[in-house]
Amino acid sequence: MYDNMSTMVYIKEEKLENVTQDEIISKTKQVIQGLEALKNEHNSILQSLLETLKCLKKDDESNLVEEKSSMIRKSLEMLELGLSEAQVMMALSNHLNAVESEKQNVRAQVRRLCQENQWLRDELANTQQKLQKSEQSVAQLEEEKKHLEFMNQLKKYDDDISPSEDKDSDSSKEPLDDLFPNDEDEPGQGIQHSDSSAAAARQGYEIPARLRTLHNLVIQYASQGRYEVAVPSCKQALEDLEKTSGHDHPDVATMLNILALVYRDQNKYKDAANLLNDALAIREKTLGRDHPAVAATLNNLAVLYGKRGKYKEAEPLCKRALEIREKVLGKDHPDVAKQLNNLALLCQNQGKYEEVEYYYQRALGIYQTKLGPDRTPNVAKTKNNLASCYLKQGKFKQAETLYKEILTRAHEAEFGSVDDENKPIWMHAEEREECKGKQKDGSAFGEYGGWYKACKVDSPTVTTTLKNLGALYRRQGKFEAAETLEEAAMRSRKQGLDNVHKQRVAEVLNDPESMEKRRSRESLNMDVVKYESGPDGGEEA
């Protein structure tokens, strides 16, 4: 019997385990309904018994009714208990459903957070990579900045090249053995080139025409940014020359110079310097240590060292180039003056201002002696450089004197001799300083005294001189005079830019082929071997 009962209980438990939660809820609701019905029925019976009990006297029958009433009350209590338990089960079920729903929501939120976490990890990894690349770029840009600062000092002009100087330039006259031509565009340039070329010819080497042609092609490709054509062309020509003439041949050295030019344009200064060192060794071996081509290579090598900030290493190379040019051309040759300018700026970058002053003064003496009047561009540029050197040393009076000389010569070249009615702009500026606040008619100084006409002089050297002298006036507290010169410099620069733009537009419209050739020459001229700082060879105060 007990075995049968245990088996029945086990079967019932197994059945309960197989019942789903929804079925349990449904059956519980049915049980609640049944219990409610029983409760109502028992209440009715109890009321009936109580009414009956009131009508009966105390006897056996009334005792029986009381006993039945007591049983009904117990049944009602059990029904109440069953209803309470059923309601608790329903509440528990609702709570479990809510918990399950919350659980699903939490799981969904966890999945979303996991996805967001993965996305943030990916973003962090990408950001770290970008940061690393940015740091590398910053380091590279710092190096490039140093190079560009020095290149700015090497350039004869910036992109605002004077139209009159553009007109005088002639790339066909540039000596090919100078990787970066260091001769400035000026009258008499052809004579200087012929002197240099003649000196080279007397010492037994002349650059073949085919290499000159290749050089011009490479310059054209480089100006167009087509290095993928220029570099293989140079390397192939170099390989052919080494096969036919051997490595130690002047033509090979020339080809190395041309390839170094391309590397220089790509900012590969170290590779370009290696090529120039090789070219220098070949030229010293084949042409002799005192050949003009050796001087040119030394000069170009000094420039590349300078672009890398190695001024100390560049200085002896520049000095040796100066010695060779003095020996070959004479100590008073204009090319020697140019080399002195280069050497002066190298010393300036090292803070050797006494040597800078000496080199600039000597170069100025050569220019004034050999190039004639005091109005040549080289004289003005060298005076500007010397004035900048004076500023560095605190010799403000000497600098002011030179700046005034430059402006006076420029004014005379444009408007004739100076007199009471025809004064250079610095005189008008000082008059304005003396008379500030005293104009009787209240007219703007832009129309006063005719000083604004000096703005027609659009030489970059004059523009820089105006800025520097204006800064010097400010240092002296002459603010009205400074504003006069600064306004003139601004007008001069704007007029120069407008003229250059008009000329280039006209060239493109009239002769595109000529324009392309001019660009090729311009790319050469913009990288002249000289260490003058600023767009026109003078460092602004």
Swiss-Prot record:
Subcellular location: Cell projection, Growth cone; Cytoplasmic vesicle; Cytoplasm, Cytoskeleton
TPR repeats: 211-244, 253-286, 295-328, 337-370, 380-413, 463-496
Positions of modified residues (Phosphotyrosine): Y448
Protein task: Kinesin is a microtubule-associated force-producing protein that may play a role in organelle transport. The light chain may function in coupling of cargo to the heavy chain or in the modulation of its ATPase activity.
Modified residues (Phosphoserine): S162, S459, S520, S523
Quaternary organization: Oligomeric complex composed of two heavy chains and two light chains. Interacts with SPAG9. Interacts with ATCAY; may link mitochondria to KLC1 and regulate mitochondria localization into neuron projections. Interacts (via TPR repeats) with TOR1A; the interaction associates TOR1A with the kinesin oligomeric complex. Interacts with BORCS5. Interacts with MAPK8IP3/JIP3 and NTRK2/TRKB; interaction with NTRK2/TRKB is mediated by MAPK8IP3/JIP3. Interacts with CLSTN1; phosphorylation at Ser-459 inhibits interaction with CLSTN1.
GO biological process terms, semicolon-separated: axo-dendritic transport; cell adhesion; microtubule-based movement; stress granule disassembly
The protein's name: Kinesin light chain 1
Gene3D superfamilies on file: Tetratricopeptide repeat domain
Listed Basic and acidic residues bias regions: 156-176, 495-505, 514-524
Family statement drawn from the similarity comment of this UniProt entry: Belongs to the kinesin light chain family.
Disordered: annotated segments: 156-201, 493-541
Entry keyword set: Calcium, Cell adhesion, Cell projection, Coiled coil, Cytoplasm, Cytoplasmic vesicle, Cytoskeleton, Microtubule, Motor protein, Phosphoprotein, Repeat, TPR repeat
Cysteine-cysteine disulfides: none
A Pfam cross-reference name: TPR_12
Organism: Mus musculus
Main localization (coarse): other
PTM entry text: Phosphorylation at Ser-459 by ERK inhibits interaction with CLSTN1 and localization to cytoplasmic vesicles.
One GO cellular component term: cytosol
